[in-house]
């Protein structure tokens, strides 16, 4: 169970972490720009 959790976590963090960071930056900028305007 531990080896499977480690492999799933590592893959999610490397692939999901990079994609989640890009999506969060775009969502924050869009929401801030709309509220500022």
Swiss-Prot record:
Single GO molecular function: DNA binding
Q: In which tissues is it expressed?
A: Testis.
Gene Ontology, cellular component aspect: nucleosome; nucleus
Keywords, comma-separated and alphabetical: Chromosome, Developmental protein, Differentiation, DNA condensation, DNA-binding, Nucleosome core, Nucleus, Spermatogenesis
**Example GO biological process term?**
cell differentiation
**Major localization listed first in the record, in broad terms:** nucleus
Q: Where found in the cell?
A: Nucleus; Chromosome
Region feature (Disordered): 1-37
Q: What does this protein do?
A: Protamines substitute for histones in the chromatin of sperm during the haploid phase of spermatogenesis. They compact sperm DNA into a highly condensed, stable and inactive complex.
* Protein known as: Protamine Z3
- What does the record give as the organism's lineage? Eukaryota, Metazoa, Chordata, Craniata, Vertebrata
């Amino acid at each position: 169970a531990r080896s499977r959790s480690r492999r799933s976590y590592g893959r999610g963090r490397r692939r999901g972490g990079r994609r989640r960071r890009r999506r969060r930056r775009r969502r924050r900028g869009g929401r801030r720009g709309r509220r500022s305007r």
